[in-house]
């Protein structure tokens, strides 16, 4: 299979288009390969063929479907080197960081096979009640640009395992790995069970509004998530949303600073901060504040010098504006060194020291290598500051006293709390956000069941 020509995949076949777009290499702004732009007719054909494939696919047993996912995982890993090169190119990653995504993503293909979809039976004097979980039908998976493979597979695998057919829509900034992923999948799955469409900004709304698509699963911005909710309401679609998170870390005064700071730095700057659960706001106890910030800046310098670019120019401009606004507001900016290749979408990683907690740069999610460090004097203050956000995706707590850290975690208004370790998702653990960070959960058994509809059958005696 060639990894330098790209097609939409409809009805199991590669499909070119009259119109194409080309991505941009974030390292040097050079144009990448042409990718076909799907039309409204392509959407109709993909949905129709998915509907036709659904009965036979949904009638397979859960075990049969997960065995095919395992087979696909094996085939995918045979081509891991090609996917590593593709991710490195379209995302601007180092080879090592590209490999992290490619190999970790395979775990999401395998995790459904560790579960069974439950059937619950209860009985009383009058009847037996049976609760089953059935596939929905056609699912549209709308994916972002920061981890195009892993986040796509995190939606594809549970949807297919539970008997649905999937139409994948990658970000127009990073279509290439998704197009190749689905092309490769045709060697394993029946035609039209898994399709992919790349297109302009009108493609997502076409899928969301389509009356014969039963569910939308989306990862991306809160603004787009809200629009999806509005558009999906017309047909009462099931919706799972994972949206923005202005994530907080709380560092208690009893931590071993020398042990904790390198872990914090690694989590902050991985993938140039383009991680949905990365820390954006760091609340540090006043007794260790100056030392912790100084050590964080020092520990970050080596990481910052080799930092990758922002994936696209649109996001780069947003981050540049955030830093400009912070500077104009008088915030103290600790720049961690200049990046080497100025031609690409590079930005200096920056620590904001003691910005006002209500400043725009603190309250908005800066999806990139910018972190605000703010001191607190009491646990109640730290918890209040951390919860002072419209979003609630993730948080972390650092303390030598695990019991104290757990008490803090219990009061944080977020979907995911990481104690004494950097934020990392786990395919076996439900993942979702509170407040405006999303609806529903992905991963684990609850994530699998989110692709099902529940049926209760009553057998009267």
Swiss-Prot record:
Where are the annotated coiled coils located? Answer: none
Phenotype when the gene is knocked out: Does not alter fusarin C production.
Q: What inducers act on this gene?
A: Expressed under high amounts of nitrogen via regulation by GLN1. Moreover, components of the fungal-specific velvet complex VEL1, VEL2 and LAE1 act also as positive regulators of expression. Finally, expression is induced under acidic conditions in a PACC-independent manner.
Top-level enzyme category: oxidoreductase
Give the positions the UniProt entry annotates as the active site: 242, 276
Q: Which CDD domains match?
A: ALDH_AldA-AAD23400
Asked if the record carries the keyword ATP-binding, the reply is: no
Q: What is its EC number?
A: 1.2.1.3
Q: What is this protein called?
A: Putative aldehyde dehydrogenase FUS7
Question: What organism does the record attribute this protein to?
Answer: Gibberella fujikuroi (strain CBS 195.34 / IMI 58289 / NRRL A-6831)
């Amino acid at each position: 299979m060639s990894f330098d020509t790209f097609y939409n995949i409809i009805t199991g076949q590669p499909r070119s288009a009259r119109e194409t777009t080309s991505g941009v290499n974030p390292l040097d702004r050079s144009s990448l390969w042409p990718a076909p732009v799907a039309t409204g007719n392509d959407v109709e054909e993909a949905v129709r063929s998915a509907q036709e494939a659904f009965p036979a696919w949904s009638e397979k047993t859960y075990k049969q479907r997960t065995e095919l996912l395992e087979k696909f995982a094996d085939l995918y890993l045979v081509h891991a080197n090609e996917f590593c090169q593709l991710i490195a190119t379209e995302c601007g990653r180092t080879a090592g960081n590209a490999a992290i995504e490619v190999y970790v993503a395979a775990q999401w293909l395998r995790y459904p096979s560790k579960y069974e979809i439950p059937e619950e039976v209860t009985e009383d004097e009058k009847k037996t009640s049976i609760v089953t979980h059935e596939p929905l039908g056609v699912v549209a998976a709308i994916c972002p640009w920061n981890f195009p493979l892993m986040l796509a597979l995190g939606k594809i695998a549970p949807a297919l395992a539970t008997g649905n057919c999937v139409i994948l829509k990658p970000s127009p900034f990073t279509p290439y790995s998704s197009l190749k992923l689905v092309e490769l999948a045709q060697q394993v799955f029946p035609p039209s069970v898994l399709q992919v469409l790349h297109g302009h900004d009108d493609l997502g709304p076409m899928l969301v509004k389509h009356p014969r698509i039963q569910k939308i699963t989306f990862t991306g911005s809160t603004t787009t998530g809200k629009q999806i909710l509005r558009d999906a309401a017309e047909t009462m679609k099931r919706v799972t949303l994972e949206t923005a998170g202005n994530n907080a870390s709380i560092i208690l005064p009893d931590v071993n600073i020398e042990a904790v700071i390198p872990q914090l730095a690694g989590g902050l700057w991985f993938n140039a901060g383009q991680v949905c659960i990365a820390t954006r706001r760091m609340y540090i106890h006043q007794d260790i504040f100056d030392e912790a910030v100084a050590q964080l800046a020092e520990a970050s310098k080596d990481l910052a010098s080799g930092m990758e670019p922002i994936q696209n120019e649109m996001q780069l401009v947003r981050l540049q504006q955030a830093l400009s606004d912070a500077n104009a507001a008088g915030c103290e900016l600790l720049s961690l060194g200049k990046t080497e290749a100025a031609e690409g979408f590079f930005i200096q990683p920056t620590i904001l020291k003691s910005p006002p907690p209500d400043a725009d740069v603190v309250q908005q999610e800066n999806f990139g290598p910018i972190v605000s460090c703010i001191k607190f004097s009491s646990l109640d203050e730290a918890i209040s500051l951390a919860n002072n956000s419209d979003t609630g995706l993730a948080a972390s707590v650092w303390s030598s006293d695990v019991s104290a850290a757990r008490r803090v975690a219990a009061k944080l208004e977020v979907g995911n709390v990481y104690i004494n370790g950097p934020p990392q998702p786990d395919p076996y653990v439900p993942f979702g956000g509170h407040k405006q960070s999303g609806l529903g959960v992905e991963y684990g058994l609850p994530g699998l069941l989110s692709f099902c509809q529940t049926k209760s059958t009553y057998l009267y005696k």
